[in-house]
Amino acid sequence: MMHLSPNRIVRVVVLLAAAAGALLPDASAQTLVGAIDFHAHGDPDGTARKIDVIDLAKAAKAAGMRAIVIKNHYEPTASLAYIVRKEVPGIEVFGGISLDLTVGGVNPAAVEWMTKVKGGYGKVVWLPTFDSEAQVLRDKRQGPFASVVRNGQILPEVLQVIGLAAKHDLVLETGHSSPKESLLLIAEAKRQGVQHILVTHAMTNPGGPMSLEEMQEAARLGAMLELVYSPLTDRQLQQEAEAIRTLGAASFVLSSDLGQPQNPLHTDGLLAMYKGLMANGVGASDIDLMSRRNPARLLGLDR
């Protein structure tokens, strides 16, 4: 009798789902089989969360998902990804580092250390999020913040982090930078040879959402753009569907950004997002591209 490893079983399920999708055009948008959540929050965290990362991985695996990326605004998650993989085999789990104040802000040493964590599952660098200058000023908060640009120039430590992303083939995310900052960062990242750049929740960014024209420029420069649950509204879905039609699905990644106690579970939110976009005219093949193939390419899963 032939025995298959858990990862091979998942790949077989993905292939069977793809075959079903070829026969039933809408099938891939009605299921999470093979999907990847590039932006998943869970406990342990200093912020209240709906579910811990072990149960999150179990739920994602039960739904047939291929991978999740664990995000925490204030703690690196590469080591957490290693532990979750041991506890929940059969789904690929990745982590990263968000360059907020608890890791020293934009700290090249912290990024370098993350790349050394056993397993090599630290794949993503988020430039400052909650502590970004753009969000702190936009929220009119008092207190320190982490800057990425000053007087129109990218700061030296940010240039170093971009260089590390290129060196270690990491996914560089813009975090909660402003649209203007993000475009500067994307151009510099491409100049330094970063292969994988993602604009974090491009249309709902607390540091300032991108306009359609700014998203077009980001895509032209070589970045992909993330769309998230948010939570969903009819207006948001209409605007996202219009952006997908204008730029093309090849430029987008669909993530949940879920884990908040008041919001749905990640799996439920992703399905609602897929169905909502389809109701606004986005095709099943585009959902497949944005939820499966594009994030897999960012993570290097199909090499």
Show which residues each predicted segment covers.
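N-terminal secretory signal peptides that target proteins for export/translocation
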Residues: M1-R8
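Bacterial N-terminal signal peptides
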Residues: V10-L23
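Histidine/acidic residue-rich metal-binding segments in metalloenzymes
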Residues: A27, V53-L56, A78-I83, P89, ...
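An N-terminally biased module of ancient metal coordination in phosphate/nucleic-acid-related enzymes
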Residues: S28-G90
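Hydrophobic faces of well-ordered beta-strands that scaffold small-molecule active sites
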Residues: G34-A40, I68-I70, F94-I97, V125-L127, ...
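Glycine-rich phosphate-binding "P-loop"
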Residues: F38-A48, F130-Q153
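Short acidic/histidine-rich active-site segments
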Residues: V228, A249-H266
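Mid-to-C-terminal alpha-helical segments outside catalytic/metal-binding sites
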Residues: G269-R303
